[in-house]
Structures are given as structure tokens and as C-alpha cells.
């Protein structure tokens, strides 16, 4: 990765624009002089070396300028910045900078003096205005200021004055109440942040065995009246659990008494901790009986200890010993049978009647067992090292010296980091024992070597342009948390139990075992309880505080010799990382940026490895089946069932409140998607690597290397250049820099994907899945999966192949023509005939992809087209094509799937026909139909003399309107649609560009008008959904609903809230738009509801299709509304797909939605706390929900016979 870094920066170009200065004499060689001398004796020309020096100085000056702005910034007193040592610029320019700073200082002092004088003069007037607002009427003003104007003389004036004063009093009262509410919310937010920090502190103390420290901090805050409000029942229970595990009964009782003293009532967890402690220390029977009696008086029966709590095995055993000692006849209740999902839509899936053909994996039991242990080793290691596919550099003397220098530096840094970490822990430990909840226990969660390893990894991947401190801190905090959670599972013997359970689970999946057919989740649950107690995730402020502390250690400890950066000057160390400020949009952002010399060192060394976190890489064995919110996917690494922005808690809360059986459908669908085994298409990968290592090819989606980035014509201007020329050069340099950074980003993404593909070549792997808040599914590994680009999809094949059968080859050919995009309006029979016509081109593409006629390169999806050409070539050349084993996934796409759902909801006959819900001989193309109708509107307007309509003659095409038609169903506005059309028009070289703005305005109106006529029910449903969401959010609630498969959904769009993490390098301000304590963001709530609701329907349709395909023995995966399976199984998948769409829309979806919204937002319990204005909104909401959109006469059963519904 380091070889891709781009070290030029537009912010420090001043040095580049100056005339070249004299050459400096070389410095004496120091400890690392070998590398410096090799740089001096490189093959680069003097001109190139001079340019590099100029760029280096520009980078250093950028750092200096940022530090000056940072330290001298006005209006940002919260930004406290520690002194960071920087390498000074050349001496020849120091006086100029000193003069500039001195001048700025004088100007600032003068301005500050003027401001102070103005403030002093206006103070009295300010308070007068604040207390008594001026009314610009002399007569009325007199009544408001009686001390200046006297008192009113007649009764009419007195009444008027009293009325005005009363009105102002009410206004002031309302303002005061609003201010009080705002302050109360701010205090609540601060207390919540503190509570999250304290709870994480206590849990870390218990995990690291430092219960006395937790006890000490708890007592310190309990005895302080102001601080006691921060303590919660969960915190007291956590400390009690720590003492229980140590068997320290006296200390536990002390905490129990503190809990009572704080006015809290003990819960089931409190009594469980006490009884565990008694079970561990063999407490006398009377004490245990008294505890049980008190517990039952509080309403908790002993059976609940074993049914309502998820306990570690050792804790459960100690608890049982204590209860049995007091009540010898007690027996824990047996495990309750798994509840059964009773959803109408899922009745066939969970029915025990009828034949089932659940597919098994193609691998035997021994192989799967071996793969499990390989994956377990990977997850215990927490990271994966992968060989980079970047072209290896020539091992010149310069490269060898750079690698030696880098290795020597890293050895020094590890020692220094270890020292600084120990010093920090000692300091924080002393503060913690003074009663402060510091980060000390967090720094004890992992070994010191693990912390150093995490920090050293940061230095390898930090980009040359730097990384925002908030982002770096968050990533560091998450890494520590994830490694801690894995380590906890090792400590509690969870790993050994998992190995035993997984061996039994593989009996269901292996190809050489015989087990009664069963869903993976059902089989896993039948093996007995394994689930460990859910780990409480740390809050974002806690993650940031820990990550920021680690980042500060890195800045403080990691230094390098100055000789690596400059040829002259004192032989001393300089920082490798600099903390600077930059502007991102309108916000000032703190950034950790590597020194340019360090970046150059990394680039020169060009190390051949990349390192990924475990969860960033596909799994080497089948994922764990999803059985709950906390159990599924990776073996040890924690994975969220519902992915969301960090800090979002409302989704988790709703899911936890769900009856377990309600989520069985989504859980089983995610498990089925994750159980699909994959392999890499090795032949295609070789071709891609050949192009990647050459110079890339953007038309084929292979990004070129940095060396292909555009360069400015010149780097410097001759002396005496005008300001205009300087400005032009600056713009040119900035443009080149922008393009180069974009290329770097794309190149890095391709590098990760191809390196992982090469790493997994000749291996079978799996992609565990989870879902977003709408129910849409996604693979967990981010860099290499089937949801990526054309190139990413082409590199993947099913690991299990299946014979083509009698019609499989035909479907391969049809799939090939679909990928080219050449015959979209033709029937399947015509596409098949066309494939036979171009068979020579297909075979030439397969045999000579880079040297032949390259027909495949003209396709819409070139790499997938090439992969299909190769598969077709192998099949037609095999002795028996029907017996050919095919691994290629064949796709079936929905026809504008969002509009299909809208048309089905509204039973819209015209709309249904446009999106292939009705049978037809040829596929209907809604985009072409809209373009045709818009052209008719244009012709009519042109006849009437409208200039823009006349200019657009010959330019209205399917491509111009497609994106707007596609996204209008997902809530695109006229403004957004205009921008989309404008972009398409600018791509037309022969379109008069002066008419682009006017033409895009005209076309977006016509597109919306066309859709209004074609999809009448669609617009009515969209309006109904939008209006409902508008009323709900104005009344103060976020919009909620439940999908047909039972997933509870809540839109996490709220007004922004801010939390500050102070101290250290800088204060970090965390801005969140998902804080449910804030009011809903009305605009996002109402605009988001229609598209999110439709997304929840398309995810329900996909999950139903996946489960029924699994029941029939098919391998099925999806990319949202694009369904994949083997060529031979396409007819079966299409049949299932249509059936489940009809079954889904046969449900009263809108009626059920209206009932849910009424119950949730219009019930007496919901509105009793609302204001009168908000109750009026609820009344209007009830009226809106009662008036459902009218539906048409479309017969939904026609979908069953529609060949092109998905095609």
C-alpha cells in the first residue's frame, strides 16, 4: 500500500512557486546515513531530485503553517494542543515568517482592543435589550420603559400597557422554559456520557481482576452526593459480580447495602451475584435461605435465575450449588422448546410436512473440520497478513537500504512505545486509585505487546495525506474492544466448547454424513445452550477517549533521525507524526499526518505485505448460524446482526423487545446466504493482474498506478511571473493533486480486492451476512465480495459446481447476452439466437482475451461477460454439454424492482404492464417508455414554439432519463433529478452546452409528468407515506414499522447532537444524527419513509425467495434485486421468485401498516404526554391513516405467468 501514497499537497504550494535556490552541501552521515547516501546516489536526474526537494519543503511548510494557524487561532479556545517538535524551514526564509507573524500579532492586538471598547460601551444597552426588547413605536416604548417616560395617564393606556407587559412576560416565561429544557437535555446528555464511561470502567476492572479498584471508585462516588447520580444499578451489579467471582462475601454485602442506600431496588442480577458468591464460598444454609426469601419477596422466583439470565457455565454452577443447598429439592427448569414462527408467509418454511431437499456442502466432514481450525487460528490472531499483488520493485541498493532503515526504526519504536505505555499506565493507575475513572483498566485489557502491535500497524497504513484524529481514534478503540472480546472468550473456555459444538454442527452440512434434514439454526439450537452473556459494547465517547490516548502515545513515542528529512542541521530526532488542522467542508478537523520523509521511506521500501483485521476477510469455514442478535457469522469476532452507524441504539432495543420466533425468518435467510461456498476464478484473476501490474485500464475498471496520474506542465515559474500565471499554476497543481488522490483511492481499493483474491486462490471460502435497518442484506467482509463492481463479481464463482442439464447451456448464453446489454428489448428466444450468431466472437474472447478481437470489452459488464464467454467455451467444447459441471453464477434481475412493488401495492394495471408484472411476448422497458412519452411531450411543445423543446430534438434517449426514473421510486426530488439529467446532457458532445441548465429543468418536469400518468397509484402511495411520516415526526416521534417478515424498523434520523471528548492533542467533538434523545429530523423522516418502506418490501421478497430455494435444494445468493443461482436451476428459481412475490403482495400490506401506525402513534398511552398542538397532528394522522390510497384492478396472479418479471 505504501507504494501508492501521494505526498504532494495543494495547501503548501508556496514553496514550489518560488524561484529555485542554491544547492546545499550534503550533511554528514549519522546512524542512518546509509539510507541517506543511497538516496543521494540514486539514478534520478538532478532536476528530478530538485523537484522532490521542493515538494518536501512544501510539505514541511504546510505543517508549519498549520501549526501556526492552530496555535494562533481565534475563537477556538477548546483546542488545546501539546507542543510538537517540527523541523524548521531553511534559515533563508525565517525572517520573512517572523515578520509576518509579528504583523499578524499587532493586527490582532489592535482588533482585540477595538472589540473590548465596543463591548464595554454596549454592555448596558445589551442588557436593556435583553430584558426589555425595544418596540419601534415611541408611544408604546414609553409604556415599556416607565422610568424614562413616566406612567400612563388614562385607563385605556394603562390597559394597553398591562396587556403588553403580560404578553412580554408570557414570552419571557416561554423562553425561560425553552432554555431550561435545553439545559436539562444538555445535562442529561452529559450524565449519559459519564454513565457510559463509568460502566465501561467497572466492567474493565472486573475483566482484568481489579475489583478493589472498581470498589474504591464506586465508594468514592457513592459518598459524594453530586456524583452519586451518575451511578446506576448496572454499575453496582457489575462490582458485585466481580466480588462474587472472587468469593468475597463481605465486600459484596457492602456494595449491596450501598445499592439500597442509593435508593435503588436490587434486581434479579443483584441476587444472582449474591447467590453465586455464596455458592463459591460454601455459605451457611441460613444466609442463603434469607437471601432467597428476600428475593422472592421482591417478586423473583428461583427458576428465573436459570431462565431469564444468560450466565457463564462457571457462574451458573456456583449459583445452582447455592440454591440447591438451601432447597435440596430444587431443579433448574428444562430448556424451553424453541418457539415456532407462526407468520402466514413462512408457514411452508417451518412446516414439518411435505418433502424438503436442504442442500449439503460439497466438502467431507474431515475437510470442514480442518477448515474450522484454520479459521479459529485466524480469529485468535486478530489479523491476517496477505501478500500484495503490486508489482515488486527491483531490489536495488536503495530499496535494500530503505528496508533495513525501516526495520531498525521499528525496533526502536517498539521499545519506545513500550516505555511510554508503561509510564502512561503508571500515571493513570495513580489517578484511578485517587477515585477517578481513568483509562487505566482499559490499558490492562490486552498485553503491552498487543497494544504496541496495534500501534505499529497504524504506522503501516496511515495515508500520506493523513487521517482525521476522530476517525483514527475510533478505529483504534474498536480494535482494542474487538481483541478484548475475543480474549474474554478464551478466558471463559468458550473456545473449547465452541469447537465441540461446531463439530456436531458440521454433521448437518458435510457431504459424507447422514442427518435428518433440518434448518441450520434449528439444528444448532437442538444441540443445547452455548450462547455466552452478551458483552456490553462501549459507547462512542469511550472508544474515542481510549483511541485518542493511544494515538497520543504514538505521536509522543515515534521519532526518526533528522537526517532522513534534511541533509544539514543538528543530528537530532524529529517526530514521525504531526498533529495539524485542515478544513473539511466548513469544519476544522484535526489530522495526524506522517512526515513526508517517512512517507518517502515507506514508498522506497515498497514492503510486499498487507494486513487486514479478521472481520475484513472472508471466512475459511461455514459461518455460525444466526440464532439471536448476538450469535452468528464469525466464530469469535463480534458481528452485529443489524449494521448501523456507530452509536445507534434504537435498532438494538427494538430487536431485543421482539419475541424470538418473530425473527426466525430473517435469521434463517441470513444463515442461508452465508452458507454459500465461493472460490476465485483463477484464470480471470491472472488476466486482471497482468493489466493491473502493467498500467491498468480505466475503461475496464482496473485503476492505473500513481505514475500514470496527470502531471503539471511545469512545477516552477521563471522569475518575474505575473500573479495570474501563479494562480493558473496553483489551480493546475491542485487539479492534478485531486485527480492523483482519486486514482490513489481507486488503486488502493483494487489492490486490496486483488490481493485478497490472490490470497484465497485455490481455496474455498464463505461470506457471512448481516442486514441494515431496512432488512437489506450485505456480506460482512468489505473488500472482496459479490456486491462489488463488475470486476469483483467476475472474480467469484460458486465453489460447488452443478451439471448444466438439458437447458443450462441455453441459460448461460442468455445470461451472456444480458451482460453485454445488446438485446434488452428482445425475447429470450431472440437473445439465444443472437448468442449462436456471435459464437465466433465468444470463443475468440475466451481464447484470446487480450490479443484477439476483444469483443467482450464492448459489453456493459466486460469482466463478467469475459467470465461467461470462458464458461460457454468450456461447455460447448465438452463431450456432453449437459453433463458439464458449471460453477458460474447466472443472474436474474428485477425490472425496476421498486416500481414493481409500487405497482403491486396499488394494483396499477398500466404501471404493472410497464414493469413486466403482466405476461408479454417481449420484455417491457419502462425507461424506454418514459423516454418515448417525454419525446411526445417535447414534440408538442416544439410545435408551440418552445425554444428548449426545439433544441432537445434528437437528444432524448433511454440513457438520459434512466437514472431519474430508477431513483424517483426511492424518493429523488426534482432538484436531484435535474442534476442527474444535467450530467447526462453534459456527456453528449454535440449538445449545445449553453442550454444544459434550461434543458435539464424542462426534462425533469416532463419525466415526473410522464411517471404521474403511467403510475397513478405509485404517486398516491408515495404521497400517503410521505404525509404520514411528516405528521409522525412533527409530533415528535421517529417513524417505525414492521416488515412482513417481522423485522422491526425505526428510522434513525434525528437532529444533530454534539458530545465533546476533551483533553490531549485536541478536544474531539462528536456530532451524531442518530441520538434518539433528540427530536426527529422531520425532513429526513418524511423523505426517507417511502424509499425505506419499499426497500423493506424488496428485502422481504428476497428473503422469502432465499428460504424457499433453500428448501428446494438450490444454492441462492442475491445482490438486492438481482438473484443468482446455477444455470441449471434458473427455471426453478424464477418460479419461486414469482410465487413469493404474489404471496407477499397478497397480504394486506398497506392496511397492516396503517393498523400498526395507529396502534403505535395514535393510542391513548402514546398521546397522553403530548402538547395540544401535537395532539392536533395525531388527530390529522388518524384521518390520513384511515384514508388509504385507492387501488386499481390489476390481477396479481398474472405475475406467475410473466416470463420477464425477473429476467
From Swiss-Prot:
GO terms for cellular component: DNA-directed RNA polymerase complex; mitochondrial nucleoid; mitochondrion; protein-containing complex. Pfam families: RNA_pol (PF00940), RPOL_N (PF14700). It comes from Mus musculus (Mouse). Keywords: DNA-directed RNA polymerase, Mitochondrion, Nucleotidyltransferase, Repeat, Transcription, Transferase, Transit peptide. The active site is at residues 893, 962, 1121. It is an enzyme of class 2 (transferase). PPR repeats lie at residues 232-266, 267-302. InterPro entries: DNA-dir_Rpol_C_phage-type, DNA-dir_Rpol_phage-type, DNA/RNA_pol_sf, Pentatricopeptide_rpt, RNA_POL_N_sf, RPOL_N, TPR-like_helical_dom_sf. The gene is Polrmt. It is found in: Mitochondrion. Residues 773-1207 are annotated as: Mediates interaction with TEFM. Homodimer. Component of the mitochondrial transcription initiation complex, composed at least of TFB2M, TFAM and POLRMT. In this complex TFAM recruits POLRMT to the promoter whereas TFB2M induces structural changes in POLRMT to enable promoter opening and trapping of the DNA non-template strand. Upon metabolic stress, forms a complex composed of FOXO3, SIRT3 and mitochondrial RNA polymerase POLRMT; the complex is recruited to mtDNA in a SIRT3-dependent manner. Also forms a complex composed of FOXO3, SIRT3, TFAM and POLRMT. Its EC number is 2.7.7.6. DNA-dependent RNA polymerase catalyzes the transcription of mitochondrial DNA into RNA using the four ribonucleoside triphosphates as substrates. Component of the mitochondrial transcription initiation complex, composed at least of TFB2M, TFAM and POLRMT that is required for basal transcription of mitochondrial DNA. In this complex, TFAM recruits POLRMT to a specific promoter whereas TFB2M induces structural changes in POLRMT to enable promoter opening and trapping of the DNA non-template strand. Has DNA primase activity. Residues 1-41 form a transit peptide. GO terms for molecular function: 3'-5'-RNA exonuclease activity; DNA-directed RNA polymerase activity; sequence-specific DNA binding. Its main location: mitochondrion. Belongs to the phage and mitochondrial RNA polymerase family. This is DNA-directed RNA polymerase, mitochondrial. Residues 1-48, 82-103, 702-724 are annotated as: Disordered. It catalyses: RNA(n) + a ribonucleoside 5'-triphosphate = RNA(n+1) + diphosphate.
Amino acid at each position: 500500500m505504501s507504494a501508492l501514497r501521494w505526498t504532494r499537497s495543494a495547501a503548501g504550494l508556496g514553496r514550489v512557486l518560488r524561484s529555485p535556490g542554491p544547492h546545499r552541501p550534503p550533511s554528514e552521515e549519522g546512524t542512518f546515513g546509509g539510507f541517506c547516501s543511497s538516496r543521494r546516489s540514486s539514478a534520478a536526474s538532478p532536476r528530478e531530485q530538485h523537484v522532490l526537494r521542493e515538494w518536501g519543503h512544501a510539505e514541511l511548510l504546510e505543517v508549519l503553517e498549520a501549526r501556526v494557524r492552530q496555535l494562533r487561532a481565534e475563537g477556538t479556545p477548546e483546542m488545546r494542543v501539546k507542543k510538537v517538535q517540527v523541523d524548521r524551514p531553511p534559515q533563508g526564509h525565517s525572517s520573512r515568517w517572523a515578520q509576518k507573524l509579528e504583523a499578524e500579532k499587532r493586527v490582532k492586538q489592535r482588533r482585540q482592543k477595538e472589540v473590548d471598547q465596543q463591548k464595554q460601551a454596549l454592555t448596558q444597552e445589551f442588557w436593556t435589550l435583553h430584558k426589555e426588547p425595544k418596540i419601534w413605536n415611541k408611544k408604546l416604548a414609553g409604556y415599556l420603559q416607565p422610568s424614562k417616560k413616566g406612567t400612563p395617564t388614562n385607563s385605556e393606556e394603562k390597559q394597553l400597557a398591562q396587556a403588553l407587559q403580560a404578553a412580554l412576560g408570557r414570552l419571557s416565561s416561554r423562553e425561560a422554559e425553552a432554555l431550561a429544557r435545553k439545559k436539562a437535555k444538555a445535562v442529561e446528555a452529559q450524565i449519559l456520557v459519564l454513565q457510559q464511561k463509568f460502566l465501561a470502567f467497572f466492567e474493565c476492572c472486573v475483566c482484568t481482576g481489579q475489583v478493589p479498584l472498581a470498589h474504591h471508585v464506586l465508594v468514592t462516588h457513592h459518598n459524594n452526593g453530586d456524583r452519586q447520580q451518575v451511578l446506576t444499578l448496572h454499575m453496582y451489579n457489575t462490582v458485585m459480580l466481580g466480588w462474587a467471582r472472587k468469593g468475597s462475601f463481605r465486600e459484596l454485602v457492602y456494595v449491596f447495602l450501598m445499592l439500597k442506600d442509593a435508593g435503588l431496588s436490587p434486581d434479579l442480577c443483584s441476587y444472582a451475584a449474591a447467590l453465586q458468591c455464596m455458592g463459591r464460598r460454601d455459605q451457611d444454609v441460613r444466609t442463603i435461605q434469607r437471601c432467597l426469601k428476600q428475593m422472592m419477596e421482591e417478586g423473583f422466583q428461583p427458576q428465573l435465575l436459570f431462565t431469564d439470565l444468560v450466565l457463564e457455565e462457571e457462574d451458573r454452577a456456583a449459583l445452582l450449588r447455592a440454591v440447591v443447598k438451601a432447597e435440596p429439592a430444587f431443579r433448574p427448569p428444562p430448556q424451553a422448546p424453541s418457539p415456532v414462527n407462526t407468520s402466514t408467509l413462512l408457514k411452508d418454511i417451518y412446516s414439518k410436512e411435505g418433502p424438503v431437499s436442504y442442500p449439503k456442502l460439497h466438502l467431507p466432514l474431515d475437510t470442514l473440520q480442518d477448515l474450522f481450525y484454520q479459521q479459529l487460528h485466524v480469529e485468535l490472531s486478530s489479523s491476517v497478513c496477505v501478500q500484495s499483488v503490486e508489482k515488486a520493485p527491483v531490489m536495488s541498493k536503495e530499496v535494500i537500504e530503505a528496508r533495513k532503515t525501516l526495520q531498525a526504526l521499528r525496533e526502536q519504536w517498539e521499545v519506545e512505545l513500550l516505555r511510554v505505555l508503561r509510564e502512561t499506565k503508571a500515571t493513570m493507575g495513580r489517578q484511578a486509585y485517587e477515585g477517578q475513572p481513568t483509562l487505566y483498566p482499559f490499558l490492562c485489557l490486552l498485553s503491552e505487546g498487543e497494544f504496541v502491535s496495534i500501534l505499529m500497524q497504524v504506522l503501516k497504513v496511515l495515508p500520506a495525506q493523513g487521517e482525521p484524529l476522530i476517525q483514527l481514534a475510533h478505529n483504534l478503540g474498536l480494535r482494542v474492544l474487538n481483541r478484548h472480546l475475543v480474549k474474554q472468550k478464551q478466558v471463559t473456555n468458550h473456545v473449547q466448547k465452541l469447537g465441540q459444538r461446531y463439530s456436531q454442527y458440521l454433521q448437518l452440512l458435510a457431504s459424507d454424513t447422514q442427518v435428518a434434514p433440518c434448518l441450520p439454526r434449528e439444528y444448532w439450537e437442538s444441540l443445547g445452550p452455548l450462547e455466552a452473556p452478551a458483552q456490553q459494547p462501549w459507547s462512542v465517547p469511550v472508544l474515542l477517549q481510549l483511541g485518542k490516548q493511544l494515538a497520543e502515545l504514538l505521536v509522543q513515542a515515534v521519532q526518526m533521525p533528522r537526517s532522513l528529512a534534511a541533509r544539514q542541521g543538528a543530528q537530532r530526532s524529529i517526530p514521525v507524526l504531526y498533529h495539524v488542522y485542515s478544513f473539511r467542508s466548513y469544519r476544522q478537523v484535526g489530522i495526524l499526518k506522517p512526515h513526508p520523509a517517512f512517507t518517502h521511506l515507506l514508498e522506497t521500501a515498497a514492503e510486499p505485505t498487507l494486513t487486514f483485521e479478521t472481520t475484513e476477510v472472508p471466512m475459511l469455514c461455514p459461518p455460525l448460524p444466526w440464532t439471536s442478535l448476538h450469535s452468528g457469522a464469525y466464530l469469535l469476532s463480534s458481528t452485529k446482526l443489524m449494521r448501523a452507524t456507530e452509536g445507534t441504539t434504537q435498532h438494538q432495543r427494538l430487536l431485543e423487545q421482539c419475541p424470538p420466533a418473530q425473527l426466525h425468518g430473517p435469521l434463517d435467510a441470513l444463515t442461508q446466504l452465508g452458507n454459500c461456498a465461493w472460490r476465485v476464478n483463477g484464470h480471470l484473476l491472472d488476466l486482471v493482474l497482468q493489466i493491473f501490474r502493467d498500467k491498468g485500464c480505466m475503461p475496464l475498471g482496473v485503476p492505473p498506478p500513481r505514475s500514470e496520474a496527470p502531471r503539471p506542465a511545469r512545477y516552477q515559474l521563471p522569475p518575474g511571473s505575473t500573479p495570474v500565471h501563479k494562480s493558473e499554476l496553483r489551480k493546475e497543481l491542485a487539479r492534478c493533486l485531486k485527480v492523483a488522490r482519486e486514482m490513489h483511492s481507486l488503486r488502493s481499493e483494487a489492490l486490496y480486492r486483488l490481493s485478497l483474491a490472490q490470497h484465497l486462490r485455490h481455496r474455498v471460502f464463505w461470506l457471512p451476512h448481516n442486514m441494515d435497518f431496512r432488512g437489506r442484506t450485505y456480506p460482512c467482509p468489505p473488500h472482496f465480495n459479490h456486491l462489488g463492481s463488475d470486476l469483483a463479481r467476475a472474480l467469484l464463482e460458486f465453489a460447488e459446481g452443478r451439471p448444466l442439464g438439458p437447458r443450462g447451456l441455453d441459460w448461460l448464453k442468455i445470461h451472456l447476452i444480458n451482460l453485454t446489454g445488446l438485446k434488452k428489448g428482445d425475447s429470450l428466444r431472440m437473445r439465444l439466437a443472437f448468442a449462436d450468431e456471435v459464437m465466433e466472437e465468444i470463443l475468440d474472447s475466451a481464447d484470446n482475451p487480450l490479443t484477439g478481437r476483444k469483443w467482450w470489452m464492448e459489453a456493459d459488464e466486460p469482466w463478467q461477460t469475459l467470465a461467461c464467454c470462458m464458461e460457454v467455451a468450456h461447455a460447448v467444447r465438452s463431450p456432453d454439454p449437459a453433463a458439464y459441471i458449471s460453477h458460474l453464477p447466472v443472474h436474474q434481475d428485477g425490472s425496476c424492482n421498486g416500481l414493481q412493488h409500487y405497482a403491486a401495492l396499488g394494483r396499477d394495471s398500466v404501471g404493472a404492464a410497464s414493469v413486466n408484472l403482466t405476461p408479454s411476448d417481449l420484455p417491457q422497458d419502462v425507461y424506454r417508455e418514459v423516454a418515448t412519452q417525454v419525446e411526445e411531450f417535447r414534440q408538442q411543445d416544439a410545435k408551440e414554439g418552445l425554444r428548449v423543446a426545439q433544441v432537445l430534438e434528437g437528444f432524448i434517449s433511454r440513457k438520459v432519463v434512466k437514472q431519474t426514473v430508477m431513483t424517483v421510486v426511492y424518493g429523488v426530488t426534482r432538484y436531484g433529478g435535474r442534476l442527474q439529467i444535467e450530467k447526462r446532457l453534459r456527456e453528449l458532445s454535440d449538445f449545445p452546452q449553453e442550454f444544459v441548465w434550461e434543458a435539464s429543468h424542462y426534462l425533469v418536469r416532463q419525466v415526473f409528468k410522464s411517471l404521474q400518468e403511467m403510475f397513478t397509484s405509485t404517486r398516491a402511495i408515495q404521497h400517503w407515506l410521505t404525509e404520514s411520516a411528516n405528521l409522525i415526526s412533527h409530533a415528535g416521534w421517529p417513524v417505525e414499522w414492521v416488515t412482513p417478515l417481522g423485522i422491526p424498523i425505526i428510522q434513525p434520523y434525528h437532529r444533530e447532537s454534539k458530545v465533546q471528548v476533551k483533553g490531549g492533542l485536541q478536544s474531539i467533538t462528536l456530532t451524531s444524527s442518530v441520538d434518539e434523545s433528540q427530536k426527529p429530523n422531520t425532513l429526513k423522516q418524511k423523505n426517507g419513509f417511502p424509499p425505506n418502506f419499499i426497500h423493506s418490501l424488496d428485502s422481504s421478497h428476497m428473503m422469502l425467495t432465499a428460504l424457499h430455494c433453500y428448501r428446494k435444494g438450490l444454492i441462492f445468493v442475491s445482490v438486492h434485486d438481482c438473484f443468482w443461482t446455477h444455470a441449471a436451476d434458473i427455471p426453478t428459481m424464477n418460479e419461486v421468485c414469482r410465487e413469493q412475490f404474489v404471496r407477499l403482495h397478497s397480504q394486506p400490506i398497506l392496511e397492516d401498516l396503517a393498523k400498526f401506525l395507529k396502534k403505535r402513534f395514535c393510542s391513548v398511552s402514546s398521546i397522553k404526554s403530548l402538547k395540544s398542538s401535537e395532539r392536533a397532528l395525531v388527530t390529522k394522522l388518524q384521518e390520513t391513516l384511515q384514508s388509504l390510497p385507492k387501488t386499481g384492478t390489476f390481477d396479481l396472479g398474472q405475475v406467475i405467468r410473466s416470463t420477464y418479471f425477473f429476467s
